[in-house]
Amino acid sequence: MNWIGKLIGMMLGFILAGPIGLIIGLFIGHVVFDQGRFRQWFQTTASARSQPSKIQEVFFNTTFRVMGFVAKADGRVSENEIRQARQVMQQMNLDDSMKREAIRLFTEGKQPNFNLDESLNELRQACVFQPALLRVFLEIQIQMASADGQGLSGQKRQVLQTICRRLEVFGFDYNQFEQRFRAEQNYQRYQQRATQDPRAYLNDAYKVLGLTSAATDSEIKKSYRRLMSQHHPDKLMAKGLPPEMMKMATQKTQQIKKAYEQIRKVRSMV
């Protein structure tokens, strides 16, 4: 029965694009269906979707492996990058056993023979129905890439862009992602200062919501609700976010809420 995929592909290809489509459909039907790649992909993703614990395991393992890879992207791992890895472990409130495992995974990612594509492919398949988790993963990686405090080097940015392409997050724009991250960093520093002027760092507050000051009140409310829904800790955990990362998700929603409240206060929004 290994000819069914070819037949279906040929029929669809001919209907959509005539004789040329027939040839293309023959090839796609053979490679994707008859050779079992589609079946294998479906079985893998369906299995991951039905096992949240599997998603949590893959997410945790890939997060620390790729953090190690990103840290070593420019040839060496700095003290600031090691400190960032430890900070993530602290935020996750890992016990001694899990810390040792996280360190092992981080070290594994630094090795020259680390297979980035294989690791990302496993994560992508596990989270194929959970793009919100992939966004959390990317946020952790850009934090690592920026740990030196000197901005993103060309090598680190190239690695991040490669990771984004491999994960194939629908509707994801890397440049917007990096811009929002920078705004969040600036806004966090603003929050740690004593000034109470709500107009300070207002542009960064807009960027935290993925907007500009030209946005309408309606657009601001819509973006706020969307981001709060995307990053809600309980929702993320239900989708497969490891329980240890709940604190990080909570901090994210708190920052989104503070940015929204600052904008609302300046605009006198109801």
UniProtKB/Swiss-Prot annotation:
One of its GO terms (cellular component) is plasma membrane. Coiled coil: none annotated. It is a single-pass type III membrane protein. Residues 1-6 are periplasmic. It comes from the Bacteria. Residues 31-270 are cytoplasmic. Keywords: Cell inner membrane, Cell membrane, Chaperone, Membrane, Transmembrane, Transmembrane helix. The keyword Transmembrane applies. The chain crosses the membrane at residues 7-30. This is Co-chaperone protein DjlA. It comes from Coxiella burnetii (strain RSA 493 / Nine Mile phase I).
